[in-house]
Regions:
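A structural signal for small-residue-enriched, beta-sheet-centric alpha/beta enzyme cores
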Residues: 1-77, 81-84, 92-333
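Active-site catalytic microenvironments for nucleophilic, acid-base chemistry
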Residues: 89
Length: 333
């Protein structure tokens, strides 16, 4: 039986650290994944209202095949400035590409945003949004251990009509292959079945990581868009006002095309955990990070291993989504 890594976090994948920065007054924040060493990245965007930066550089046809960090942030378009802060902090640490010996270090730092501008926090920042400073602060706090729930990019998030947040999980596939996921959960859809207690992702749960609740004997009522009236009243039915932002990682070096396939397969984790998902109101975006020394072979063997990794990444992402909401709504948060 496959088990999570020691931390049950994306940082069980060697070479990754995660940092949060949270502004309680504004009810927003930034979560950054730092890639230490040699990493390749890709991204897959499925939602109808995404907000992002530097995602095109990750496309398989483009020449840059390294990545230094991924930024998940609140703040909608204002939040994209968080990547400026992360980029500046990393360049100051001499992390990044150099196009000439005299060049500044140029970090490759893609970012994606979620909308939390109507969550009740103080957004009267005038000409000084907090996100660049939050980005720098997230680099300073990066570690292999980090908080889950209403923190960082998940501080002001909503999952349907309840609190969303940050979640993370991992899965050890053996033979040196570790898969992990990180998510900021802010969808228009629901992560809970109609009983209001059981997560749609329950079949994938390990060790009661999101409460261990199981559905009753009766079949669930499968409303295509649960709580439609309340979502409309809460202003959630606006394109771009919701999203789920994910990062999956594996301890094997893949090509950019293979990393893209990994990101695409991992999107299935959203469909396993949220109903509905990939809606016009969402900006669902999943990044894939690949780096490490695990050998996945060549030819048909490599394709089989990539399929296995992609399936595990989807499961990890589904678990992370449920865990994010569970932690955000626990009595201690």
């Amino acid at each position: 039986m496959y088990r999570p890594g020691p931390l049950n976090l994306i940082t069980d994948v060697p070479g990754l650290v995660v940092g949060h920065a949270t502004d309680e007054r504004v009810m927003t924040g930034v979560t950054t994944v730092l890639c230490q060493g040699d990493w390749t990245g890709a991204v897959d965007v499925r939602g109808g209202g995404p907000g992002s930066r530097e995602t095109e550089v990750l496309a398989p046809e483009n020449f840059v095949d390294v990545i230094h960090a991924v930024v998940l942030t609140g703040g909608s378009v204002f939040g994209l400035a968080a990547a400026d802060g992360v980029t500046t902090a990393l360049s100051h640490q001499n992390v990044g590409l150099r196009l000439s010996p005299a060049s500044l270090a140029i970090p490759i730092v893609p970012a994606a945003v979620l909308h939390d501008l109507t969550n009740g926090g103080d957004k009267a920042w005038g000409l000084n949004p907090p996100y660049q400073a939050l980005g720098r602060a997230s680099v300073a706090t990066a570690s292999t251990t980090f908080a889950l729930g209403a923190v960082g990019a998940g501080r002001g998030a909503k999952a349907g009509l309840i609190k969303g947040g940050i979640g993370s999980t991992s899965l050890d596939l053996g033979d040196g292959l570790m898969v992990g996921a990180l998510v900021a959960t802010n969808p228009v859809g629901s992560v809970l079945m109609p009983d209001g207690q059981t997560y749609w992702a329950w079949p994938f749960e390990i060790d009661k990581e999101f409460g261990g609740h199981r559905p009753g004997a009766s079949d669930p009522v499968t409303d295509p868009l649960p709580e439609l009236g309340r979502l409309r009243a809460a202003g959630r039915l606006t394109p771009g006002a919701n999203t789920t932002l994910g990062v999956v990682a594996v301890s094997a070096r893949l090509t950019k095309a293979e990393a893209k396939r990994l990101a695409m397969m991992a999107q299935d984790g959203l469909a396993r955990a949220i109903r509905p998902v990939h809606a016009p109101f969402d900006g669902d975006t999943v990044f894939a990070l690949t780096g490490g020394t695990a050998d996945i072979g060549e030819g048909t063997e490599r394709l089989m291993q990539l399929s296995r990794i992609g399936s595990a990444a989807a499961d990890c992402l589904a678990r992370a989504i449920a865990r994010s909401v569970y932690c955000a709504n626990s009595p201690s948060t």
